[in-house]
Curated annotation (Swiss-Prot):
Family statement: Belongs to the RecO family.
Superkingdom of origin: Bacteria
Role description: Involved in DNA repair and RecF pathway recombination.
Pfam family, one: RecO_C
UniProt xrefs under PANTHER family: DNA REPAIR PROTEIN RECO (PTHR33991:SF1)
GO cellular component terms given for this protein: bacterial nucleoid
Organism: Xanthomonas axonopodis pv. citri (strain 306)
UniProt keyword annotation of Protein biosynthesis present: no
UniProt keyword annotation of DNA repair present: yes
Paired cysteines (S-S): none
GO biological process: DNA recombination; double-strand break repair
Keywords: DNA damage, DNA recombination, DNA repair
The protein's name: DNA repair protein RecO
Length: 240
């Protein structure tokens, strides 16, 4: 199959043999595509190597043969965000999450839109943690894994003053008061869930619980195997 003039975001790149690269690209029309870029070393290939970098939006043509497509041509369509520190790790995270969750050769246009929006947010003044929670919410929705952010698992309106445990299958499970002390780290406030559903940034005190709860849901859909970027973020937090 010939893929011509397709737009895509570079999610991940690694060396293959001495002069080639294996590149994972997220496209709107073809889903996640694995590309084999042969012979990209040398001064005459500098522009191509520069285009095949994570976060870069490219236009490419390739021939699909089996699992990998043979790259014929690629060019950068813009300048990827220049990131450092926490935002650089966040860029690694959004790419790794979609690398694991986006199906190969199965287009999910919503995931393409999610990545494009998250990429813009990384280069903006939007609070980083809030941008990532919105990204996670939208990825789950795009994959058909969204849960109700207005009602709990029993169909009752979410109480902003209560705490909930997010279950990947059942959604928000209200935590009984007698269990609250032992479950506090594993729960999120109703106020944070309502805010997430309304696309309004929760209070700063509610953000850690929302992060942990969303991570638990994502971990389920990742098959119980976490992300390297999570380990890197936790290691960075311990050093601070």
């Amino acid at each position: 199959m010939l893929i011509e003039h397709e737009r895509g975001f570079v999610l991940h790149v690694r060396a293959w043999r001495e002069t080639s690269l294996l590149v994972e690209v997220l496209t709107e029309q073809h889903g996640r595509v694995g590309l084999l870029a042969r012979g990209v070393q040398g001064p005459r290939k500098q522009a191509l190597r520069a285009a095949l970098q994570p976060l870069q939006l490219i236009q490419f043509s390739a021939v699909q043969r089996g699992e990998l497509a043979q790259l014929r041509q690629a060019e950068a369509l813009d300048t990827a965000p220049r990131l450092a520190g926490d935002t650089m790790l966040a860029g690694f995270y959004i790419g790794e999450l979609l690398l694991r969750l986006a199906p190969r050769h199965d287009p999910v246009p919503e995931l393409y839109a999610c990545y494009a929006q998250a990429r813009r947010h990384l280069a903006s003044d939007l609070p980083l943690a809030w941008g990532l929670r919105r990204f996670e919410r939208d990825v789950l929705e795009g994959l058909g894994f969204a849960f109700d952010l207005q009602h709990d698992s029993e169909g009752q309106p979410i109480d902003p003053a209560a705490r909930y445990r997010l279950d990947p299958q059942d959604g928000a499970l209200r935590v009984l008061s007698e269990r609250l002390a032992q479950d506090r780290r594993e729960t999120v406030t109703g106020a944070a869930l309502l805010a997430l559903g309304q696309d309004v940034m929760p209070d700063a005190d509610d953000m850690p619980g929302l992060r942990r709860s969303m991570r638990g849901v994502l971990l389920h859909h990742l098959g119980g195997r976490g992300l390297k970027s999570w380990e890197m973020l936790e290691d960075l937090a311990r050093r601070r």
